[in-house]
Amino acid sequence: MYTLYILSLLCAFVTFSECKYPPGPIYPHRPIYPIQPVYPDHCPGVCYIACPNGNIHDRNGCPICRCRPDECTLPRKIGPCRASIPRYYFNFVTKRCELFFWGGCQPNKNNFETIYDCQGYCGYAERRYPYPYVKRTY
């Protein structure tokens, strides 16, 4: 518990300008335990609960990997209206952005106009690192 308290202090006082590395690729929420990445640009796929934004931090408390926003775990929502507007949603099961036809009203936050918006927000990283638990040796 003391470690989580120290991590929360680091998250509160270290600014991004002091950080060595930019944020890495986005991954879904994983079991919560602290872990240091093998490479600074590779996300190990876990989230600290000590930090309010759920980012993984390096030894200096700097963000190196952003966890997938909760919106990306929502199911697609067509809505009660009868329009047929092409939209994209992130399918949390297949780990891909997929096309669906939105009714035109009452969307949830997992509703994107383009596949690029969906991939940028919910993570295109699954194609590059489809198995975040597997340590690559090549």
UniProtKB/Swiss-Prot annotation:
It is found in: Secreted. Residues 1-19 form the signal peptide. It holds the Pfam family Antistasin. SUPFAM superfamilies: BPTI-like, Leech antihemostatic proteins. SMART domains: KU (SM00131). This is BPTI/Kunitz domain-containing protein 1. Residues 72-122 form the BPTI/Kunitz inhibitor domain. Keywords: Disulfide bond, Protease inhibitor, Secreted, Serine protease inhibitor, Signal. Coiled coil: none annotated. Disulfide bonds join 72-122, 81-105, 97-118.
